[in-house]
Amino acid sequence: MSGALDVLQMKEEDVLKFLAAGTHLGGTNLDFQMEQYIYKRKSDGIYIINLKRTWEKLLLAARAIVAIENPADVSVISSRNTGQRAVLKFAAATGATPIAGRFTPGTFTNQIQAAFREPRLLVVTDPRADHQPLTEASYVNLPTIALCNTDSPLRYVDIAIPCNNKGAHSVGLMWWMLAREVLRMRGTISREHPWEVMPDLYFYRDPEEIEKEEQAAAEKAVTKEEFQGEWTAPAPEFTAAQPEVADWSEGVQVPSVPIQQFPTEDWSAQPSTEDWSAAPTAQATEWVGTTTEWS
């Protein structure tokens, strides 16, 4: 599809992105219409998607999107969680109309519905999950583009982009690649310079994981503040000039104090014992006499 134009050939960095995101990994089941996009089958039963065919169909889909004069006439849909963020990012970059979440039946066919719209092109993430918009597109003669896995049905799909539409990284990377090629074909960005938007912004993230990361970051910040408050207090600044002493032995005079000698006693000698019985007897006699005089 890219032909002999070297500008449209797949670069090595693009191949590395596809391999890192697992875009080439299909499922264990194979639809008969997807056989043309299969490269080989692994020993565990997983089919390998030919990335060359993926790149060719990606360029064809980008050309179809660029052919629409009004970007808002392109509807991009993803009912699965893994593609909702990528759809919103793609719509913000290219100007398309996103439908993230549940698709209201009758959006393309029921004219009295509040959400009724008449797009000129439809792009879906999964033909099996987004079967309702594909069916309604067939009623109003609407061309469709779909990211198709090895087991995806190709009924009502006009341009099938073979890729892994189950993994969050693969779906986000495919929408990022499609948005980049659309902007390049429109002339918004140059092919000589890399796009400043990273594919990570198109990846789906679980809200529980985001909440856990935010809590961990908050706890880490609080712990860091407490540590700094206890151990990294600002040291007092001394601005007074300190006296300079050349020789500390000369600067301080230490007075000499004579050492007092105490006589040594022999603690082993037994102390002299006194007769305490005589004195109490004499005192008792005196008290007796005193009491006699009172009587």
UniProtKB/Swiss-Prot annotation:
It comes from the Eukaryota. Residues 54-113 are annotated as: Interaction with PPP1R16B. GO terms for cellular component: cytoplasm; cytosolic small ribosomal subunit; membrane; nucleus; plasma membrane. The modification N6-acetyllysine is found at K52, K89. SUPFAM superfamilies: Ribosomal protein S2. Acylated. Acylation may be a prerequisite for conversion of the monomeric 37 kDa laminin receptor precursor (37LRP) to the mature dimeric 67 kDa laminin receptor (67LR), and may provide a mechanism for membrane association. Cleaved by stromelysin-3 (ST3) at the cell surface. Cleavage by stromelysin-3 may be a mechanism to alter cell-extracellular matrix interactions. Required for the assembly and/or stability of the 40S ribosomal subunit. Required for the processing of the 20S rRNA-precursor to mature 18S rRNA in a late step of the maturation of 40S ribosomal subunits. Also functions as a cell surface receptor for laminin. Plays a role in cell adhesion to the basement membrane and in the consequent activation of signaling transduction pathways. May play a role in cell fate determination and tissue morphogenesis. Also acts as a receptor for several other ligands, including the pathogenic prion protein, viruses, and bacteria. This is Small ribosomal subunit protein uS2. The gene is RPSA.
